[in-house]
Every structure is written in C-alpha cells, then in structure tokens.
Amino acid sequence: MDIRRIVLYMALALIGLSLWNAWQIDYPAKQPVEEKTASQLTSDGHLLPQIIPSNAEQPVTLKAEEKASSGKQLIQVKTDILDVDIDLKNGDIVKGLLLDYPLSVEDKNKPFPLLQNQASQRYVANSSLFVLDGQTPQSLDFDFTSEKEYYELKPDQNQLIVTLNGKSEDGLDVKKEFVFTKGSYLIEVNYKIANIGNSLWKGYFNTQLLRSSPKEDKSSIFHIGSYTGASFSNPGKNRYQKVSFSDMSKSNLDVDAKGGWIAMQQHYFLSAWVPNADSENKFYTLATDKDYTIGAVSQPITVKPKEDKIVGSKLYIGPEITSVLKGISPSLDLTVDYGILWFLSSLLFSLMKAIYTVVGNWGWSIVLVTVLIKLAFYRLSATSYKSMASMRKLQPKLQALRERYGDDKAKISQATMELYKQEKVNPLGGCLPILIQIPVFIALYWVLLESVELRQAPFIFWINDLASADPYHVLPLIMGATMLIQQKLNPAPADPMQAKVMMFLPILFTGLFWNFPSGLVLYWIVNNTLSILQQWYITRKYSDEKPAKKVVATAK
C-alpha cells in the first residue's frame, strides 16, 4: 500500500460519508415504538395521545370531537432575543422569531421564524390540560384572557411574567404563566390550578411540538444534509434517540420516562419541552396525513375541592448552542449532532471557540485550528512524507525490476520486498500517520457542518457566510488546485490506470465541494497548503542527501 492508495481511500471515504448521511435519513434505524394506535385531533390543533386509565382494562377509544375555532386571538410577547405570539384559545405558542438570527444574509432585517402558524408551514408548541370523558380524552378549553395584547421586556428588567386567566366548565380556575428571562431562549410554562368546585378533579398535563410536513434536508453526494425530525431523551435508557418523520408515519412512540426531554430538530435550531427532572411522563409521537407530533403527557393529576396545584414544564426555542443546552437538561447538547466522534468534535469546537474569543472571526479561527492540528501531527506527517521521499528515490530501481521480470508478478513482488529491506524503506511508513489523522478530520468535518456559530459568519472579501457555499465557487477551484499541486509532489504511479484515476481526483473533489459550506472548503484549502509546504520541504531535504548505495536486487 502506498500514499496514492491512501488518497484514493480518503476520496472513497468522503463519498461514502455523504452516501451514509443520505441513507441514514432515508432509512433510519428503527426506534422503540409500539403498534400505531388511534389519536384525537381537536379543531384547535391538539393531538391527544391514547391513555390507559388505572380503572380501565382496555385502552380508551378516541373519537373525533368538534370544537369551536379559536378565532386566532393572539397576544405578542417580545424580549431582547425572542418575539412570540400566544393563542388565547389554549395558550399555545404559535409564533417564535429569533431576533438575533436573521433569516438570511440577504434579509438581515427579518428574524428567523422557528415557530410559525402559516397555511404553508405549521410548527407550534402546544401545552394543555385534559381529562377522560368516559373512554375519550377531552382537552379543556379555558378561552384565556389577558390584561394586555402586547408585552415587552424592558431594558432594565431581567424577567417578564405573562399571565393568562381562564375557567373550565368543571370548576377549575386556572392561571397559565409564561416566564421569560432576559438573554434566554428558555420559557417556563406553568399551570396554577385552583379547584373551586365541590368534587375531586382528575386530569393530565400535556406538552407537545406539532409540525406540518416539513421539508427534510436530505444528503447527496454533492450536498451535505442535516437531520430534520424529532428526538427524545429517556435518562438511564436512551440519552439521545432520533425519531424520524417516516418512523412516526409507521408507528407511534410510547415510552415511559422520568425527566428527560422531547424535541423537534432542524439544521442549527431546536425546540424542546423539558419536564421537571423528577416528573414521570409518557413520551409519544402521532402522525396524520399532514402533521407530525412528539409529546409528553404526565401521570394523573388530582386536585381536591378548594385546593391548588401547580404543574408545568420548560420550553426551549432557539439555536443549538452546546454551552446553553448543557445547562438546561442532561444530553440536550447531543442534539448538536456531531456524529459518532462527538467527544472529539466537542474538544475541537472548544478550541475553535477559544481562538474566536481572541481573533473575533470564525474564518480565522478555522485557519488557526487547522494550523494547530498540522503542528500536532507534524512528526507523524513528516514520517509519512519522509517515507514518500524514500519511495520516490527508489522509483528508478522499482521500474528496473518491472522491466527485468516482465509479467512475473511473483518475482517482482519478491524482488521488491528484498529491495525495501536492503534500502531500509518501509512501504507502509506513509500510511499509518495518515490513518491516525482521519478521525480528527471527520470530527472537524462535523464541527464545521453543525455549529450554529458559523451560520452567516463572515470571513474576508466575498465570503460572508461560512455555513453556505461560496457564491462564486472560487474556494472549490482553489481547493482543486491545491490537490493538483500535491499530486505533482508525489512520484508518478507506475500503473497507467492508477495514474489516470489520480489525475481525476482533483476534478472529483472540486465537484464534491462545489456546494459545500465555505468553512469546510476553507479548512481543506489551508490543510492542503500546509501539507504542500511540509511535503516540499521534506522531499527537498531528503532528495539533497547523499544517494543510497546501489543495491542489486535479485530474485531467489
């Protein structure tokens, strides 16, 4: 095996990685689910899961129930980083704008809409109380009222509490509170339940994320996709488990969990319900022809007459920032999907972030991290390039052996190994150093792909978004040129077919990287450039040394 084969294998590995991403999205691993059951879709958009009451031997039968429409009476709440709309019908958050994240480089004045309730795209965060009416779950309509239609967190405020007031027909006086905190994407949602009736009230607290037929970001050879779908964490069993939309269509998730969280993911952004760590819930998924839901329903809640009780959960709607997610709930940071080498990716991102705090530019941070990685692997790379230089000096002797023995491959192989032994050259010496570096490359690959910090982050000149492709495709062309220069430094392959394949590689990689994120292409350019300089120096150094003594290799 020589360095050319390693390059070929790396090319195949890159293509395989892209194909694997596409395969995982199209054919994800099966999740722990049960057979698909019935569900109830109320006219206000709530999908209620099947519940088995303690006094029932069979699962309840869910029936469709007509309810009056909400009329879409909304209130607006604005903080320093969030702008949300709350529907007074059930107190659902039906719009969530992220004020610090523009929609695109071209639309800097439009905030990114993570949650929205449009005809073309519905993505909302529901929370409700419901009871069992015989065998049928029935969502309680409180028709909430609010003191104001617009709430805003003032610059001198650290917290804003929005209270909705409502009453139910069965004797509940409910206050639904939303607690917003300055600089935070986490919202506390609490129900303060007062039983003003004369009988015991028994019901359930339900939270869910509902999304209508989202467009999934699928991978291909020429495009790197990112996971779009649901996920959950069940402490002690599943730290982080994806549930794709295709899984939801086939069968319903049904998992008992203590603590944990449920989430809807997409590239760079996340919504998640985080129950109290000591609360017990049933995590479920439901799917209709156009809607996909992941939810959590509590254990039965009882409130005696004239007594009060508070139930609630936390809702996160914002960017996938690992340092923030770590502080909210265990394993929530795993939604920043760094893949199987997440631990190594996390270390590399921490290094990138530390450099960014000094230089103030993510592009230069990528450049400097690449330099540090090359320095860390300098000796290994030097060993590889030294082996290549030695192999280059042996090319005339190897060619002479091929001419001497013609088509006798056995004698050529035997004579070649004897030559390596006499010249003290290890043909595998250039392979191991490169193989050791591959995990680092893969880990950094996922960091550059998944880190929201690179979204719309400028570098220099025309590169104004490291997470998007170079609009003029200059970087992929430069990257292809660096690969071509690297090939010129290597000895020409003796096999004509292999030589043609090697010449085609720069073209192949240029095509592969044509629409890749600029940050990823930048890494490859810097890495290739540093490799060229190191290889040129070492090759020149060993080429200038006194030539090895001529050794006549003979076949035994």
Curated annotation (Swiss-Prot):
Cellular component, GO, one term: plasma membrane
Q: Name one GO biological process term.
A: protein transport
List localization entries: Cell inner membrane
Which Pfam families does this entry report, sorted A to Z? Answer: 60KD_IMP, YidC_periplas
Q: Write out the similarity annotation.
A: Belongs to the OXA1/ALB3/YidC family. Type 1 subfamily.
Question: Could you give the subunit structure recorded for this chain?
Answer: Interacts with the Sec translocase complex via SecD. Specifically interacts with transmembrane segments of nascent integral membrane proteins during membrane integration.
Q: What is this protein called?
A: Membrane protein insertase YidC
